[in-house]
Regions:
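Outer-membrane beta-barrel pore domains
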Residues: 19-23, 56, 61-64, 103, ...
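Outer membrane beta-barrel
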Residues: 32-54, 65-221, 235-240, 244-252, ...
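C-terminal/domain-terminus segments
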Residues: 215-236, 387-402
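Glycine- and other small-residue-rich loops at beta-strand/loop junctions that grip anionic moieties
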Residues: 191, 232, 313
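Bacterial N-terminal signal peptides that target proteins for export
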Residues: 1-4
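N-terminal periplasmic/intermembrane-space "pro-region" immediately following the signal or transit peptide
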Residues: 6-61, 118, 405
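Short, contiguous, pocket-lining structural segments
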Residues: 194, 201, 214, 231-235, ...
């Protein structure tokens, strides 16, 4: 009797999923527009993400919540417009509780918008202007919920460090221990997620080599509100670049670099006398590789970063991760990621050399089941631990249901 009831529930759920899938297919056709003999094509699409997190306090990464269990819904809309073969425009807007998971109220944002000009069909040159993700590294192309094997980002993109962009430390000890006294969002990671800063980029592909160079209005570590050109102009630009080499279809190698000031304008009064924002910069050097063979995909990134910190000196850090995804069936795949971030030493102002933040390691395990071409469920467990100092740890359990249309 119980087996029959369970079979009936599974059958009903599957039938319901395919009914929704059929509706979303019809919706996709409705949201696609083509005019002027197909010379102008526009498509509106999106994803609805329903996320739930359970963690220990303080919350890991960029999660901003005073409660241990957080429900985080997000509606993302994409607009893609192609005019002829040379002009392309895209935009991304979101309705959620903040750029990063939080227990704040709802907010509507325009996260990305850009105009791209491609004069030649072979893709050797593209000129792009607007607000868009950084060209650095190989994680950004898969950072959206449908493509990302995990619910969160690698450690380097979300681990908050003692770096502050709104004020300068008054002493080395204030710099080292600031994380214990101020709320987490006063501080910055090395790279803040996909870094949707505003600017201009040039990119292209020449045979087996691809390249991208960008000038942005904010550094890779900058917070989301700094990415808007109305909030932060181009007085102190950041320059980033990536060069990639693909020897064959399976392998892809890349080298990235970035350099620019990381302080916001309001930090200027807190800087030492006769110093300005341009005197303190963030330097990032990155190496990445990816491999794909049959049902297996592997990604790896290494980052070396240096922050020039007032009254402290150079603060160096090294971070890396290995990520693997395996497709067990056309609908089920699993993923495993190992992350680590190590911090260098600075003078504490009293003749001793100390680590400027605790080294950290994290393992992420995730499984995704794709019910249809429009719906998927993702489950994740993460364990994070300090490998130096007191050895604090944190467990994260998360689930994400995504509907794509």
């Amino acid at each position: 009797m119980k087996l029959g009831a369970l079979s009936l529930c599974v059958f009903a759920s599957t039938a319901c999923a395919f009914d929704i899938d059929d509706f979303l297919d019809r919706l996709d056709n409705t949201l696609t527009l083509s005019v002027f003999h197909d010379n102008v094509r526009a498509r509106l699409s999106g994803t609805l993400d329903l996320e739930i997190y359970h963690f220990e306090q303080p919350p890991p990464g960029l999660i901003n919540s005073s409660i241990d269990t957080l429900f985080n819904p997000r509606l993302t809309l994409f607009l893609d417009t192609q005019v002829g073969s040379q002009i392309y425009f895209f935009a991304q807007s979101r309705l959620d509780r903040g750029f990063d998971p939080s227990n704040h109220g709802a907010q509507l944002r325009l996260d990305e918008y850009a105009l791209r000009f491609t004069p030649w069909d072979d893709g050797r040159f593209n000129l792009q202007v607007g607000k868009f993700a950084t060209v650095v590294g190989n994680w950004v192309p898969r950072h959206l919920s449908w493509e990302n094997p995990f619910i969160n980002a690698p450690l380097i993109y979300e681990n908050v460090t003692p770096i502050q962009d709104k004020s300068a430390p008054v002493s080395p000890l204030n710099f080292i221990y600031g994380l214990y006294y101020y709320e987490k969002y006063a501080f910055n990671p090395v790279i803040w997620g996909p870094s949707y800063a505003s600017g201009i980029s040039v990119s292209g592909r020449l045979d087996r080599v691809d390249y991208a160079v960008e000038m942005k209005n904010a550094s890779l570590s900058s917070r989301p509100e700094s990415w808007n050109v109305t909030e932060n102009g181009f007085e102190h630009p950041t320059f980033s670049a990536r060069a990639g080499f693909r020897p064959n279809e399976a392998w892809n190698f890349g080298l990235s670099g970035s350099e620019g000031p990381y302080f916001r304008r309001e930090a200027e009064p807190t800087l030492p006398p006769r110093r300005d924002i341009d005197d303190y910069r963030e330097f990032v050097l990155g190496q990445d590789a990816s491999f794909a063979w049959r049902h297996l995909q592997v990604w790896v990134e290494f980052y070396e970063a240096r922050f020039e910190v007032p009254r402290v000196g150079d603060a160096d850090t090294f971070a890396y991760y290995f990520e693997a995804k395996y497709k067990f069936t056309p609908q089920l795949f699993g993923a495993l990621r190992w992350n680590q971030q190590l911090f260098g030493n600075i003078s504490n102002g009293y003749g001793r050399s100390v680590r400027w933040s605790q080294d950290l390691a994290r393992i992420d395990i995730a499984a995704t089941y794709r019910f249809t071409t429009h719906t998927q469920l993702k489950l994740q467990y993460s364990f994070q631990q300090e490998t130096t100092g007191p050895g604090d740890d944190n467990h994260l359990i998360a689930a994400q249901l995504t509907v794509r249309f």
